[in-house]
Amino acid sequence: MMTQTLLIELLTEELPPKALNNLGNHFAASVAEGLEKAQLVDGAAEFTAYASPRRLAVQVKNVKAVQADQKIVKKGPAVANAMKDGAPTKALEGFARGAGAKIEDLTIVHDGKQDVYAYEYVQIGKPLGGLLEDIINQAVKKLPIPKVMRWGSSTFTFVRPVHGLVVLHGGDIVNVSVLGLQSGNKTLGHRFLSDGEITIENADSYAAQMREQGKVVASFAERKAAIQTVLEGQARRLNATAAADEALLDEVTALVEWPVVLEAGFEEHFLAVPQECLILTMQQNQKYFPLLDQNGKLMNRFLLVSNLQTEDPSHIIQGNERVLRARLSDAEFFYKQDQKATLESRLPKLTNVVYHNKIGSQAERIERLQSIAAHIAKALGADAAAAERAARLAKADLVTEMVGEFPELQGTMGKYYARLDGETEEITEAVEQHYQPRFAGDNLPEGKIAAAVALADKLETLVGIWGIGLIPTGDKDPYALRRAALGILRMLMQYGLDVNELIQTAFNSFPQGLLNEKTPSETADFMQARLAVLLQNDYPQDIVAAVLAKQPRRLDDLTAKLQAVAAFKQLPEAAALAAANKRVQNLLKKADAELGAVNESLLQQDEEKALFAAAQGLQPKIAAAVAEGNFQTALSELASVKPQVDAFFDGVMVMAEDAAVKQNRLNLLNRLAEQMNAVADIALLGE
């Protein structure tokens, strides 16, 4: 059957830039999926998504004009029950009637179990035009659009008004109606660089015609790659690097249909303002690409992406420079104003900054952070006074002009202002870094003072918010407690502190009776669950479960334990020892009395004597290895007792009739279990 390329384009008003790429990909994928389900393509649809500020489009290869005819077999009642005394039963008659057939039209087929009556017929394939309208409408409905709008007198809704619809199969228009628009082959190009309508000659010529006649690079991916290439080239020419993160690059790509990269600049005196402020202003407000020199310092040059191409771009450059100058002047003003007061002098204003109405203001919070940070610093062997001072100043920049304008700069501005106030570098860095890690993969705070304040900040948040009942549920976590927990865990994996003791310290910093009394135990359980999630990114679930079953309170040796258990699992003896350990644990659950020391005089059989001797020899080796942090050696020692363990279970009845003998054997197994599980609960391996 002949196939041709299918093109669908929705011509719209300017689409939301941050959502554009996602909308384009969803629309294209939904159309392709609809064509696959309708069997208008063979196998997986080969498609290309297009998305620009004024259009969403998809091009699908090898689309059929008509569905293939299908042989349909409707199966009915079993032959054995379908006839009675030579006449059809009511079941058979009902099946024939439902199938729109006569009894004599039915055939007999085997359904894999028995012979049944069936009605076989050929379903004639439907034409593309009869199916495509519903496919497009369904694709439009499935788009991830949080808010829709109506336009004109239309009752249809979409993310932005839609003014044109192109639907071509090869060179032929497919007649459909979508969002109140009749399909055609005409569209519009660039709003300013293109004149009049463009007639798309063929579905395959779409991208080329839009580029040549419409001055539109329709492919989002192609525009993005082109912008990135030119940005990098321009930056190299200036011996610089363009600060171009993915989010900004995506947003700029979504704002232009014909990208033109231009170089511009600003006055050098603005460089006296911390570069983070200038970069944020350029990127967030103006969508510009700042340029950094070889030392990572901001230059007074930047790159911008225009949607216009002119012989003389100077007016575009000057216009953008003028707008940026106003923005930078504001930042400069805020910076100068903020320097008129020290961070210390700003602290009383934090009384008016509500943290949460149930647990007080930021000023009250600062008191808690100081005590927690000082406690942690002592535990780390660091300067408690420095940690307390850093915690005291950590939130002071929240009431500065600059942070009021750019909340993203909290911490960063605190560092600069603390430095201007004459604080030590250790304290200034802690003020900035106490928010870290802000997200998965973010850097951890550098140095013990910064770590102490960062841990204090996250512990106080977790314990306080949890303690007033604002517990994360499902995908709702408004106070980012999961993120706080992961940040705490990542830091504790670096520093050897007792997680439960830290939680209790944070809890004790709140007024008595303010928080739920179960908060320490509940947050400890929550941390354990988040720790499992964190570790399962790098280790199999059973290995993580085995290590965490010991409920480690110090996390700095977790990685070594996980690696040791992973190595142990590869040993030929591991599976049998894990099974034996599980058996031991099940037997120990049946103990009637408290487990204690092994009485050698009650050991009767050679197998239990041999196991006792092996356990005796094993104990000091494992204890020494664990004490030295050599967990792999500790676990590998277990392999040496496998023969004795196997022989014991093969030849000894643990639950003997003699109560004293039974208790002694359980004591022996308990001693063995202590050694087998010194590093991890190996019974969980393989589950």
Curated annotation (Swiss-Prot):
The keyword Aminoacyl-tRNA synthetase is assigned to this record: yes
Keyword annotations from UniProtKB, A to Z: Aminoacyl-tRNA synthetase, ATP-binding, Cytoplasm, Ligase, Nucleotide-binding, Protein biosynthesis
Entry's Gene Ontology cellular component terms: cytosol
GO biological process: arginyl-tRNA aminoacylation; glycyl-tRNA aminoacylation
UniProt cross-references to PROSITE patterns, sorted A to Z: AA_TRNA_LIGASE_II_GLYAB
GO MF, one example: ATP binding
Enzyme Commission numbers on file: 6.1.1.14
Known partners and oligomeric status: Tetramer of two alpha and two beta subunits.
Alphabetical list of NCBIfam families matching this protein: glyS
HAMAP family xref list: Gly_tRNA_synth_beta (MF_00255)
UniProt-recorded name of the protein: Glycine--tRNA ligase beta subunit
Organism of derivation: Neisseria meningitidis serogroup B (strain ATCC BAA-335 / MC58)
Lineage: Bacteria, Pseudomonadati, Pseudomonadota, Betaproteobacteria, Neisseriales
Gene: glyS
